[in-house]
């Protein structure tokens, strides 16, 4: 377990900012408890400092996981968000998309979201923007990247792609073994 | 009509706006930077010097507006209707064309052509169009701000005009008041206004009142002497200047005549006018000199100087009284039979003009107004008749024109109408002139001696106060006439004056004009034509004030009555589909058909005039135009002056009319509002109004796509705490409306967001006046019903939430409301206001099962609660109730009844461990307090009285016995009796 290097933190926060914008600061400067990001075996964890201090007693090889996993760095040095960070993304998401109940399952099997399944969208969402997806009951079900802005969405036909799949809660079942 | 006349007609208006705009801007200087100020100064100076050189009709600011507009509304709908696009120009709405007519010199000729085409096509009657044109025209003249003092420049102007608008010659300007209209006397000779008046006056004064005449002369001479003394004996100064002017005008005349050959129609008329003008000036001279000579002859100067101040004052009063009397006489004479006695108006005019006393002037102006108000008929006087008047006597004599044979009665009526129109015209001319004179006097400038007003400029020096009050008087008359007879001829003049003075620096005058406009909007008997004119005029006024205007001015539009016939508006798009369709149809017509159609149309038009009713189609068109004009003004203010104080009322207006915005405009509107929300909005009221507009339009036109207006929620949430400030308390009605739109819809918003709004609203409710917080609490209750999940806020235990509640967060999504509870509601249960407890109890006892069975409609809405318990005017609402009667008291009363008012004894055994009940207190009071007992004749009192009486009787007897004993034993044992006596006294005292 170690803090991130400068390069790592740059790629990591760039990715995060794509989804939650300036609210990243709220993740780190919490009122209740100081939190921090730590890397353990290529995975980035969001962990309270107290827990982090305690876990320092455990040797690196023996430490399987701590706190909340936000994602992992690939071999090429890119960062990939994991679905486990969804709770935090959902809380601080800048742009949101609500999915109609009919398309929820499709999304949770790993498909992209079509216009037909678009229940609601935040006004002024630009294209290629990270968004968090919710069911109509405000349960977060994943995140993705928009292909069209809100304004363009108005005139789209129902079969057009609106949100590219990035991660969904179905992964908890599908990829249970590698999580 | 030729342009020379037009020129003349417009001249009186020229001076006003310049002074006015200057004045309007001055009080708002604080808002402008120094740089801007200097810029204005330079502009004004340039305007005064070189106006005549800027002879074409382009107004620079105007061009800028539209180029900016293009940039600004680059979204789809506006681009479609590009204003400068020739090809699409004709598709533009009619009014838009008119508005843009002069913006581009290249476009101008095209525009005029298209106007002409449209004129033929459009079904509205010509008058209206012309009035629009004139409106525009007036404005342009004003903006040009040319200087009338330079006569040479005038000529250049005229030439330029001729070159510039050959087309305009066709426009008939009968609705604009012509200056110095010739009056035809019974013998057919032409006389100017003053000629007639003076003749009449002389006659009248000789016949009627010798005394008043003397006084008048005295007054005049006194003032004249004073003036002469001041000027160092230069009585010849005025005549020379006047004669100079006359000469100038005479010089002008031949030049004008040359040009007149081009247009034969108007030549005679303008000739006569110019002559009249000369004659008129001479008349003034003559009058004054007559007065002078008379007074000199009478040699009353010496007497006059001897008069003390008090006597002078008395004389003045007497003069006023006399004037009043004669005013009343003349007015009642006219009103008793206007058709026969209309000539008596001249008397009123003469009183007004020939008296120097400002009070008399005011009286006469107002009485003239009242007279006109009463005698003006309920219809617009026929166009032909108006033409006849304008063309003077030539056509009236029937020179070559075959005239219809008319019956005697109709002839009589026509004659009357003609006269009425003439007098009315004169009245308006006087009003306009005197307004311009007053304005220039107030600005401490020498007024151009262009026209005669109600007073002579070279006469006495009026104080600023006098001038302002006179101005107020005049405007009162104008606005009254506008309100009562908006249908009548020359309303354009009234409209222009009124709307100009809505932004006048004097608050009283401005308010009066605003009130007039408001009531006009509310009861427009012309079906919207006048309102449209006013709206356009106000838009121009706002523009000339750089949109830095009082929010009250813009708020006036809220009074507009718009019916359901109106169609949805895209302010920068097409007026309607009709124009497009009509164009297609028309292509198939042959020439003969066209001709026939034309004839039909003119016939139809006459029929319509006769009907004097407004068809649905017409109304629709007018109201659409009105609304469009309003919207254009709104968006210009939002765009060009977002810091303007008027923004508040603009947003209010948008919120009110938002349901009338068409779907094409949705994108632009949201963009504008989004920009505003992001950085323009600083007050909670503005935020609420913007939100109302945005949510309403989205709800109406959002269609398939359901958008989440997050920014709007964030802005309102962050400004919500401002509501506790006392100055924002009035905003609660808007707030409820906006919040209902934002949160009221089922499942539109995330639960978390609703919860944070609930939390913040309940916090605010603690600080608001009771009726407001009651409304908020009831709104919270509604939210609990709509979003049952938010009831987690009411639970104190087992609530999962990560982190703490962040009360100061700006974003409702980040404040984590479920980490907190609604302790505010339980605090409010202890509120002194009696209505809190029941509502709160109901909220706090909610659970899911009850919720479904609950009938929401049964209860009063937040707004109703707010209204019904409003105690902002002090006092308690609901009033404080008397304490409830104790249940034992009721029991006792029942007992009393059952015993048929016989005596009862009630035994109470008070228990010490409890506090005394109110009943016991009352009983004890009744038995102990004798004063009250005596007043209240109740059962208890009677009983007590009896008891007392018996006690006293017993004691009395005892005393008697003791006294006897005492007297007996007195001599023997004096010591023994004393303690006994003392005892008895004690007993008596205690009883």
Curated annotation (Swiss-Prot), chain A:
Xref: SMART domains: PUA (SM00359)
SUPFAM superfamilies linked to this entry: Pre-PUA domain, PUA domain-like
Keywords: Nucleus, Ribosome biogenesis, RNA-binding
Keyword match Nucleus: yes
InterPro entries (UniProt xref): NIP7_N, Nip7_N_euk, PUA, PUA-like_sf, PUA_sf, Ribosomal_synth_fac_NIP7, UPF0113_PUA
Pfam families given in the database record: pre-PUA_NIP7, UPF0113
GO cellular component, one term: preribosome, large subunit precursor
Ranges for domain PUA: 94-170
Listed GO biological process terms: ribosomal large subunit biogenesis; ribosome assembly
Keyword Magnesium in record: no
Molecular functions (GO terms): RNA binding
Record field: transmembrane: none
Family to which this protein belongs: Belongs to the NIP7 family.
Job of this protein: Required for proper 27S pre-rRNA processing and 60S ribosome subunit assembly.
Name listed for the protein in its UniProt record: 60S ribosome subunit biogenesis protein NIP7 homolog
